[in-house]
């Protein structure tokens, strides 16, 4: 998948991402600066200052696209969209008629994302990941942790964002954090723990935790419309990117094959409701998910891409039966 070692790109993996029992361990994000409304962090929330590098296939990047849409920040934060599938040089930005939703990098002219990392730290060692948040004023990457980026987009751009909805309200934060921890470990990252496991035991441990949690979420969504409280919150937007990728990628490629999201009535209808929130459909690209995931050599060495994309998120949902 590729990494930078002392600023040099190498087509290899970080050895520490596999534990002693063969389990997948995700490396921590390395850039962790924070944008603040008042600029006290050194990075003030300003329209036109920040630029996102993303890929439609990546669920972590999808989080930031969701927040850019629901907070109506499209005019304030520019985006470069990578071509699906990790190339020899990693995430790549270019015009390609086969992928009309992908773009060159119009801010810096970087062809590969790793160029942004070495422009920020010439001796950088580690993974090169999306989303990556670039500050035009200082000319460097400031954050590549999706959970932190969406919090900034939610709370620090007041007066710049076109929508002031708070998806992390103070009264619900403790429960949102609890659900986030559960969903991240067993579902968001859980599908990767299944797909990238190197031993049968590691795979089965991740598989069992994944479906136990999906069963729990299915039951929870049978009692209430959203994961926390009576409104859409950060917890919902963090689960959604995994749900829309599950049936077209994780179910088969990552061997998460006990059942599909389509086989969970509550999760299915919940996913459709979130998809139908204004602005969200434009962030969902199922064909790109297929191409992106099935291009991962470690799980699909043949490189053959499935032809079909059998999903329809636009069908009507039944979530209005539950009180909001």
Where on the chain are the PLM-derived regions?
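C-terminal alpha-helical interaction module
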Residues: 1-324
